[in-house]
């Protein structure tokens, strides 16, 4: 027999031990993501676990309720990242967790959205959700050390990595001590891209919650930050959820040094895999990650109204481009204030 219940703070050790034991478990499944969401954006969380009569965890499903003012709510697994979804080695347990999530979404009058890094047809069968797969993660296998990795690169890539170093740029790894410099780069770059920026408090909460698993990397030109990113370590994989570079330093390619620093760190931590994060096939970030040898791995997002197709709606894409165009022209101070107020309700 098994039972399903909502996990509490006291369940973090059990939850995390289970996540770390599962091949599909990643940093976003950890309890740290729940803590960061609650601490910074104050969203309600529903972390569901299935356990045996003896208290053994059989499966988990992390969920966050996004309730924007005047708009419909979304119960999502998980927001602000690439994937979440059910973790369980047992098909029946997975089905029970999905049924529970579907009933919960109905009781909350919320749209259910579940994100996976592998196909999960049971989501469509149990919850009646459509699927889209227009985004991919870019993954790179890592050798035993960074010297071997360097030797595997083509000469052109090695030259691109050396370029910022020849221009005097330097890479530094830290934590909260580099948060201000990270956020300086991040907020300016998000405005350039036409996207509302996450609150500084969100990034700080991620660093707080993930502790030693999270690190900040910054590339400097003199005393000025030119590129910056966050890296998370979970099991044998290093993941980069956010990275940015300032356009005025583009000639020196600081992002090349940033990612090389992250790759060295991942190798030093004993990681065998590197997740460059989400991209759209064929776009600029996809090609940037591809040059490192990364291969695409499709993401599978399930939700009401989603087509079983990787093709986004044309009109929706055009509207988004218009909004991005307008946002990028607003004064930096305006988007710095408005961005976090909007971004907390955008689960992407």
What annotation goes with each model-predicted range?
Residues 2-54, 61-71, 117-251:
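A conserved beta-strand-loop-helix scaffold within acyl/acetyltransferase catalytic domains
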Residues 43-45, 107-111, 269-271:
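Short, high-confidence coil segments that cap the C-terminus of an alpha-helix
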Residues 47, 65, 119, 123-148, ...:
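Active-site/acyl-donor-binding loops of N-acyltransferases
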Residues 49-52, 60, 68-70, 81, ...:
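Aromatic (often tryptophan-rich) hydrophobic motifs at membrane interfaces
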Residues 76-83:
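N-terminal cap/recognition module
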Residues 78, 151-160, 314-322:
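Short intrinsically disordered coil segments
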Residues 86:
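Active-site phosphate/ATP/adenylate-binding loop shared across adenylate-forming ligases
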Residues 94-95, 105-117:
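Short secondary-structure capping/junction motifs at helix and strand boundaries
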């Amino acid at each position: 027999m098994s039972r399903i219940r909502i996990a509490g703070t006291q369940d973090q050790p059990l939850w995390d031990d289970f996540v770390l034991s599962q091949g599909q478990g990643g940093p976003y499944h950890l309890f740290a993501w729940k803590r960061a969401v609650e601490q910074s954006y104050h969203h309600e969380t529903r972390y569901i676990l299935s356990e045996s009569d003896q208290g053994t965890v059989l499966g988990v499903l992390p969920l966050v309720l996004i309730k924007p003012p005047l708009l419909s709510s979304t119960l999502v697994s998980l927001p602000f990242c690439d994937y979440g979804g059910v973790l369980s080695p047992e098909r029946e347990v997975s089905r029970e967790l999905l049924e529970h999530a579907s009933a919960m979404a109905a009781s909350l009058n919320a749209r259910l959205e579940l994100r996976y890094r592998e196909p999960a047809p049971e989501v469509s069968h149990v919850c009646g959700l459509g699927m889209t797969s227009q985004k991919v993660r870019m993954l790179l296998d890592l050798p035993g050390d960074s010297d071997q990795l360097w030797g595997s690169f083509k000469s052109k890539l090695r030259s691109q990595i050396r370029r910022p170093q020849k221009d005097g740029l330097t890479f530094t790894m830290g934590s909260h001590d580099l948060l201000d410099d990270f956020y300086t780069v991040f907020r300016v770059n998000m405005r350039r891209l036409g996207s509302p920026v996450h609150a500084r408090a969100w990034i700080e909460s991620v660093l707080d919650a993930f502790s030693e698993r999270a690190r900040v990397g910054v590339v400097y030109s003199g005393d000025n930050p030119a590129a910056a990113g966050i890296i998370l370590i979970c099991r044998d994989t290093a993941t980069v959820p956010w990275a940015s570079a300032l356009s005025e330093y583009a000639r020196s390619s600081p992002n090349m040094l940033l990612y090389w620093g992250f790759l060295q760190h991942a190798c030093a931590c004993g990681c065998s895999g590197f997740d460059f994060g989400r991209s759209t096939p064929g776009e600029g970030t996809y090609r940037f990650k591809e040059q490192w040898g990364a291969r695409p791995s499709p993401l599978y997002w399930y939700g009401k109204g989603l087509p079983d197709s990787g093709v986004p709606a044309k009109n929706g894409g055009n509207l988004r481009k218009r909004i991005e165009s307008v946002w990028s022209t607003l004064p930096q101070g305006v988007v710095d204030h408005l961005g976090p107020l909007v971004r907390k309700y955008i689960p992407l």
